[in-house]
């Protein structure tokens, strides 16, 4: 999945701190689904500002963990219940817009195929 969000240019550090908290929440979770989410979730920052001045961040999620909740705030609320209000305000103040969400199966995997056991033994 590719999920693109726009973040206010003066709030990129706050957004990245929020995402670091998400990483910490996923890493500390005893839920194997949450740990698998962390393993396949990266966030890329686009250096060139959007026409409106906001900064685009692309969440690259592969593989998507079936039935897992990727809601940033829910992950944070579950892990840091005492910080709910502060986390919400920080995220709200940084967030400008959801720009796009693309999901679907991989049509073509360009990664090299691993050698099969029989081919490796010859």
Question: What is each PLM-predicted segment?
Answer:
Residues 11-37:
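Short amphipathic alpha-helical segments
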Residues 17-21, 71-83:
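Short amphipathic alpha-helices in soluble, non-transmembrane regions
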Residues 77-122:
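C-terminal partner/receptor-binding element of secreted or periplasmic proteins
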